[in-house]
């Protein structure tokens, strides 16, 4: 049986090695709790053995042994249950850090209301700039997809790859309400209660296509790792989900 001092020394080493890591810090705390639980278990077991050997005890040895086993099993089950709960909490924490989109149960249905500017016959209602104006430029020639020239420059300066550029351009081309309400291409809102519609409208198809084309061409110019269109679209969907959970 290992000396509890060993676990304490191991804990100290882990704390020094992983002090800057949030996940490692959680792991260390879990290990510390395991040490505490195991130490308590050892103490309880020791006390049970001492009691069973007490000359003042009138309980038969067989019965005492059975009671010890039962109590030890109960203690072990309790520790295992506590550890399982901590592991689940740790996994939830890791999921939140790994996934860019907050997780919500599907059973929690969300309602959305189409904004006043919604136009069933013209998806350009989703655009921030529907026509040329001072300070705007076309993202690509002859596409009628406009963006603020300074914002475009900032997007290119801040982006480090195709995904980050696509996400930055997304919020400069489409309105906040569109990013909150719409899906990327328009899909049935199966998990939601909907007022006034059964399908989430999609972002303007021309603008979506121009955005993706621009990102791919600019990425090649910069020598970025080439990504397939689906990967970039998934990154855009994640950004839209962020808007939906934050503002929806």
Curated annotation (Swiss-Prot):
Signal peptide positions on this chain: 1-22
GO molecular function, one term: DNA binding
InterPro entries referenced in this protein's UniProt entry, alphabetically: BEN_domain (IPR018379)
Basic and acidic residues: compositionally biased ranges: 84-102
Record-given protein name: Putative BEN domain-containing protein B1
Organism field: Microplitis demolitor bracovirus (isolate Webb)
Parts forming coiled coils: none
Cross-referenced Pfam families: BEN (PF10523)
Matching PROSITE patterns: BEN
Domain BEN: 142-247
Biased composition (Basic residues): 103-112
Keyword terms: Signal
């Amino acid at each position: 049986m290992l000396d509890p001092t060993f676990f304490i020394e191991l804990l100290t080493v882990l704390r020094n090695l992983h002090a800057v890591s949030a996940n490692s810090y959680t792991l260390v705390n879990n290990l510390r709790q395991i040490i505490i639980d195991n130490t308590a278990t050892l103490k309880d077991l020791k006390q049970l053995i001492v009691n069973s050997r007490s000359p003042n005890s009138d309980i038969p040895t067989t019965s005492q042994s059975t009671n010890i086993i039962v109590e030890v099993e109960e203690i072990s089950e309790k520790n295992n249950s506590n550890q399982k709960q901590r592991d689940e909490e740790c996994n939830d924490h890791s999921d939140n850090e790994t996934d860019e989109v907050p997780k919500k149960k599907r059973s929690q249905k969300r309602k959305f209301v189409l904004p006043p500017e919604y136009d069933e016959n013209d998806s350009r209602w989703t655009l921030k700039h529907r026509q040329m104006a001072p300070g705007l430029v076309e993202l690509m020639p002859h596409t009628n997809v406009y963006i603020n020239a300074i914002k475009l420059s900032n997007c290119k300066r801040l982006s480090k790859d195709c995904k980050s550029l696509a996400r930055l351009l997304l919020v400069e081309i489409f309105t906040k309400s569109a990013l909150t309400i719409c899906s990327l291409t328009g899909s049935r809102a199966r998990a939601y209660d909907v007022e006034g519609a059964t399908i989430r409208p999609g972002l303007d198809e021309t603008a979506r296509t121009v955005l993706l084309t621009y990102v791919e061409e600019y990425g090649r110019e910069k020598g970025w790792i080439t990504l397939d269109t689906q990967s970039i679209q998934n990154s855009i969907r994640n950004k839209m989900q962020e808007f939906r959970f934050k503002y929806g």
